[in-house]
Structure formats: structure tokens, C-alpha cells
From Swiss-Prot:
Name of this protein: Sex-determining region Y protein
InterPro entries: HMG_box_dom (IPR009071), HMG_box_dom_sf (IPR036910), SRY (IPR017253), SRY-related_HMG-box_TF-like (IPR050140)
Major subcellular location class: nucleus
GO terms classed as biological process: cell differentiation; male sex determination; sex differentiation
Organism annotation: Alces alces cameloides
GO molecular function: calmodulin binding; DNA-binding transcription activator activity, RNA polymerase II-specific; RNA polymerase II cis-regulatory region sequence-specific DNA binding
Subunit-structure text: Interacts with CALM, EP300, HDAC3, KPNB1, ZNF208 isoform KRAB-O, PARP1, SLC9A3R2 and WT1. The interaction with EP300 modulates its DNA-binding activity. The interaction with KPNB1 is sensitive to dissociation by Ran in the GTP-bound form. Interaction with PARP1 impaired its DNA-binding activity.
Cellular-component GO terms for this entry: cytoplasm; nuclear speck; nucleus
Length: 229
């Protein structure tokens, strides 16, 4: 039994000879984890180092609110940060110029130090993330078409199931098409009949006007006898 246990224990060299790919993956994972742990211990940022980023110099309000915010947070632990900011802004507006003067002087001193330390500093505000663009007219038309198709064919067919619904809808569509064709045919025939009637009226009036001298030449007695049945 001890022999079997001893045979199961392999050295790293034997593991590398048997499966070099697995050994390489395990070693790479070990080195990656070690480097990540080293970064966490040293406090390095993986995404971006803080050496290139330069903070803006504090203004008078920030100099004053830095200590005041701590006091308000300690006095009201349940108050949210947004509510604290509103309260600090209201209190800052109520301060007189004499009360604000020391904070303005401190801000000027910090600004001079900042200029000496970073002479080429330029404030570059961060760009705000753009909101999602609204649907274009083309996109909205495509959505409308898709909705129309979905209303006409709400079911998916499997092995010939639920085809009666499609046949009914197709029959309704064909019936509506036939009704529209029939209506257009009757409208066309009605229009043609009215045009023919108008043409016949014009022809009759022209014929009567042409025969009018002949009717005038007839004598009264002859005219009555001529038109007897």
C-alpha cells in the first residue's frame, strides 16, 4: 500500500515531461496571480497610474467645506451626501465676506503653490457620456413593419400545426382584395355610363337643332296628322 502511494507522488519535472501544456498553463496562472497580488499589496492601479493625473487647486468653498462636511456627517450619520452638499451650499451663501476672507486667502496660497509645482497645467474637464440616440425615421418605419408582420403571423408553425389561423387570415385578405377590385370596377363602369349619357344628350340636342326648320315648315294640321299613332 505504501508503494502505491509513493508511486502516485510526482515531481514537477515528471509532470512537465508528461503534459508540458498543462504545466505551462499552471505556471502562467501562478505568475499572473503573484503579479496581481503584488499590485494589490503595493497599491498600484492596473488601469491607469496616478502620476499623470493632476488635481485642480481647491477654491475657497472647497477649503471651507472640507472640514465642515466632516462635522455635518458626524452629527448626522444617516444624511446622504447630496443632502449634505445642499446644506453646505446654503450655509456658504449665508456667510459674510469677512467670514469668507480667510478661506479665499488660503485658496490663493494653494493656487500659487500649484502653479509653481505644475507650470504647464491646463484644466481638461472630463467628457460626459453621450445619451443614447433616438430612433431615426427609417428605424421607426422598420419597427412598424415588423409589428405589422407580427400581428399578421403571431404563431410559428411546427409539423403543420395551427395552419387554420393562417388560412383564415389569407381568406380574409383575399376577400378584402376582391371587394376593393369589385368596387373599383363598379366605379369605373359608373363613370363610363355617365360619360356615355352625356354624349348621347349632346348628340340628341344637335339633331333637334338641325331638324328644327323642318318642323317649323309643317302646317298645324299636317303636324298633328304626321305625329298620330
Amino acid at each position: 500500500m505504501f508503494r502505491v502511494l509513493n508511486d502516485d507522488v510526482y515531481s514537477p519535472a515528471e509532470i512537465q515531461q508528461q503534459n508540458p501544456l498543462a504545466f505551462g498553463k499552471a505556471s502562467s496562472l501562478f505568475t499572473d496571480n503573484r503579479s496581481a497580488n503584488d499590485q494589490c499589496e503595493t497599491g498600484e492601479n492596473v488601469r491607469e497610474s496616478g502620476q499623470d493625473h493632476v488635481k485642480r487647486p481647491m477654491n475657497a468653498f472647497i477649503v471651507w467645506s472640507r472640514e465642515r462636511r466632516r462635522k455635518v456627517a458626524l452629527e448626522n450619520p444617516k444624511m446622504q451626501n447630496s443632502e449634505i452638499s445642499k446644506q453646505l451650499g446654503y450655509e456658504w451663501k449665508r456667510l459674510t465676506d469677512a467670514e469668507k476672507r480667510p478661506f479665499f486667502e488660503e485658496a490663493q496660497r494653494l493656487l500659487a503653490i500649484h502653479r509653481d509645482k505644475y507650470p504647464d497645467y491646463k484644466y481638461r474637464p472630463r467628457r460626459k457620456t453621450k445619451r443614447q440616440q433616438k430612433l431615426l425615421p427609417a428605424d421607426s418605419s422598420i419597427l412598424c413593419k415588423q409589428m405589422h408582420v407580427e400581428t399578421l403571423q403571431p404563431f410559428t408553425y411546427r409539423n403543420g400545426c395551427a395552419k387554420t389561423t393562417c388560412s383564415r387570415m389569407e381568406s380574409q385578405l383575399s376577400l378584402s382584395q376582391s371587394v376593393t377590385i369589385t368596387n373599383s370596377f363598379f366605379q369605373k363602369e359608373h363613370h363610363n355610363s355617365w360619360t356615355n349619357l352625356g354624349h348621347n344628350r349632346v348628340t340628341l340636342s344637335t339633331q333637334i337643332s338641325a331638324d328644327f326648320p323642318f318642323y317649323q315648315s309643317l302646317q298645324p294640321g299636317l303636324s298633328c296628322a304626321y305625329f298620330q299613332y
